[in-house]
Amino acid sequence: MSWRGRSTYYWPRPRRYVQPPEMIGPMRPEQFSDEVEPATPEEGEPATQRQDPAAAQEGEDEGASAGQGPKPEAHSQEQGHPQTGCECEDGPDGQEMDPPNPEEVKTPEE
């Protein structure tokens, strides 16, 4: 008897050659980080964006605080019931809302 079935062994596929990263070019850190670093200005460019943050805030605070008074305590009632982010809504009277009893619900007859 001779076996005429198809072979179950398959030759491995040839792998495609991929150049390693050092051959392609240098890896940039912004490709892999979530934070975006500000671009540093070159020597010939003036640094117009760089200012002392404390000096900038002082100028803003002087104009903003002149027309505003003390803030009212609007959150005093909310502090008694901290929300956890998983709060469920209760009914208008504070009791839990249960689904209606199917025996009590009247169905409209056709």
UniProtKB/Swiss-Prot annotation:
Family annotation (InterPro entries): GAGE, GAGE_fam
Compositionally biased intervals (Acidic residues): 32-45, 87-96
SMART domains according to UniProt: GAGE (SM01379)
Pfam families, per database record: GAGE (PF05831)
Record's signal peptide: none
Region named Disordered: 1-110
Recorded family membership: Belongs to the GAGE family.
Misc. remarks from the entry: This gene belongs to a multigene family expressed in a large variety of tumors whereas in normal tissues, expression is restricted to germ cells. These genes organized in clustered repeats, have a high degree of predicted sequence identity, but differ by scattered single nucleotide substitution. Their sequences contain either the antigenic peptide YYWPRPRRY or YRPRPRRY which is recognized by cytotoxic T-cells.
Name by which UniProt lists this protein: G antigen 2E
Organism: Homo sapiens (Human)
Organism lineage string: Eukaryota, Metazoa, Chordata, Craniata, Vertebrata
